[in-house]
Amino acid sequence: MRMLLIHSDYLEYEVKDKALKNPEPISEEQKKGRLEEVLAVFISVEKVDETNPDEVVEKAVNEIKDVASQVKAENVFVYPFAHLSSELAKPDIALEVLREVEEKLREEGFNVKRAPFGYYKAFKLSCKGHPLAELSRTIVPSGEAKAEEEIPEALKKEEEELVSYWYILTPEGELIEVDKFDFTGHENLRKFANYEISKSRIADREPPHVRIMLEQELVDYEPGSDPGNLRYYPKGRLIKGLLEQYVTEKVVEYGAMEVETPIMYDFEHPALEKYLNRFPARQYIVKSGDKKFFLRFAACFGQFLIKKDAIISYRNLPLRMYELTRYSFRREKSGELSGLRRLRAFTMPDMHTVARDLKQAMAEFKKQYKLSMEVLKGVGLTPEDYEVAIRFTEDFWNENRDFIVELAKIIGKPVLIEMWKQRFFYFILKFEFNFVDNLDKAAALSTVQIDVENAERFGITYYDEDGKEKYPLILHCSPSGAIERVMYAILEKQAKLQSKGIKPMFPLWLSPIQVRVIPVSEEVLDYALYVAGKLEGAKIRVDVDDTSDRLNKKIRKAEKEWIPYVIVVGRNEKEQNTITVRRRSDGKQGEMQLEDLIREIRSQTEGFPYKPRPLPLLLSKRPKFRG
């Protein structure tokens, strides 16, 4: 199936003549139709859809729901349109598919019209013309997609049938069945447990961070790409770049060696083929000549292949290797895509540690657990902002209970436990720090796993002190989680504060503009530029509002942009060589020396990376990225 989706002020049609010998029977009323404020969906049902029409209907409805939620459309016009494909389905099947799409959309609560099938029709529409107003989608039944997914049905069935046992573990070491735990005072943990146990990942509403990322001109949808691939405006790119630099510096400081590896890999590589079969995922497929490649969904592949070829001694262990993948790819279901929370292309800080044995692996695991807490603290997320999940087998719990309890003690609050009777995955122990957002959806940030399979699968060995080659254990660690997820968590946290009447703010080191200088008139613009120059020389991101707006409007504009410090300069400040500063954090305003402000800002940003201002100095020189 092929669909063209156009967000329109209106769509109207009028039947002119038969296009088929036996078109759909229609009443006089159905010969004309009109809907306003509508998502117009032009559909070609294709021959391949005949293999599984029910699945095509379901996928099409999910895609339409996804787009409708993004453009906030309640009215949907289903319009048969044969001109999107040269391989059309039989008319009777095509009509049935269109009817099913119409009916299921109605069941989802949409106001739906469908243009009649098998006729020549005149139509008019008025496209709204915003970035998401014109989109196309291709729906492929799984019978066709199966060759690309390369996921053995038996393995998927085995994973689906895996039974999880859920508990809450307290810092005191008490393991309580989740339905018997008193969640009083642990509301976010309750929400997280419900989310994990239900396993529902469909996003039915737009999370607040999407509004913020658009209003602040940070990130936007890219209609020219596949859904889940985003565009970053200058301010968003600065935040993302600083986060990338910060996490990388933390991991290198921890002792990891930074590498770079390819983004695509051969399906037929023996080690990779085994890994794919053991670790089902939805891949993007790339063909080069007769060979088929998949786009990586993690840095594991490249780092494992480097380690396979390396000569490693026990003296080198633990051996830590790191890459910031820009990008990793995973074809998430369209209904699961949600702003910065769940994407198809994402930036993943990925460290893999070769450990000699379980004792060394567990010691590293605890260190990386603490490293992850430290990394999140730097971006403004404390243990109060996220919930912990720890996952393992029953045998591992029985043999290492004190170690697991120690993890709960370190975080200082109850944690969610997922336990299995037997091991299905490649790891024996895993934790994640999960952020619960304003829609009660959870997203994993930091994570570490102890992998007991892939050293042997990839042929990764080390020479022990007895001279023999042995297989190590491997830790997978992302101390922050995907960079986009970190941005999502920061914005969602600020949305929560905003709902409580607290002014939202970025951490100062991440603020795209840290100081705005506002001259009260053009005659003191030269002094405003002098102040800005001094701040810029001290590696502080500063801009100057040189527009003709009134002073109050300039201040409101800075408030809307979450500027941490606003400096107002007039004739008095110029004559006395001082500045008047308004702080967003506490609302206080006062006169001070410029050098004192520089010291104040530098004391808060010390130890964090710096990038220069991402936009022109003067506001009058800036483009607007969103209308």
Curated annotation (Swiss-Prot):
Cofactor(s) named in the record: Zn(2+)
GN (gene name): thrS
Main localization of the protein described in the UniProt heading: cytoplasm
Residues that bind Zn(2+): C300, H352, H476
Function in brief: Catalyzes the attachment of threonine to tRNA(Thr) in a two-step reaction: L-threonine is first activated by ATP to form Thr-AMP and then transferred to the acceptor end of tRNA(Thr). Also edits incorrectly charged L-seryl-tRNA(Thr).
Designated name of the protein: Threonine--tRNA ligase
Gene3D superfamilies: Anticodon-binding domain, Bira Bifunctional Protein, Domain 2, D-tyrosyl-tRNA(Tyr) deacylase
Molecular function in Gene Ontology: ATP binding; threonine-tRNA ligase activity; tRNA binding; zinc ion binding
Catalytic activity: tRNA(Thr) + L-threonine + ATP = L-threonyl-tRNA(Thr) + AMP + diphosphate + H(+)
GO biological process: threonyl-tRNA aminoacylation
Record InterPro entries: aa-tRNA-synt_IIb, aa-tRNA-synth_II, aa-tRNA-synth_II/BPL/LPL, Anticodon-bd, Anticodon-bd_dom_sf, DTD-like_sf, Thr-tRNA-ligase_IIa, Threonyl-tRNA_syn_edit_dom_arc
Record remark: domains: The N-terminal domain is an archaea-specific tRNA-editing domain that hydrolyzes incorrectly charged L-seryl-tRNA(Thr). Catalysis of tRNA editing is performed by the charged tRNA itself.
EC number: 6.1.1.3
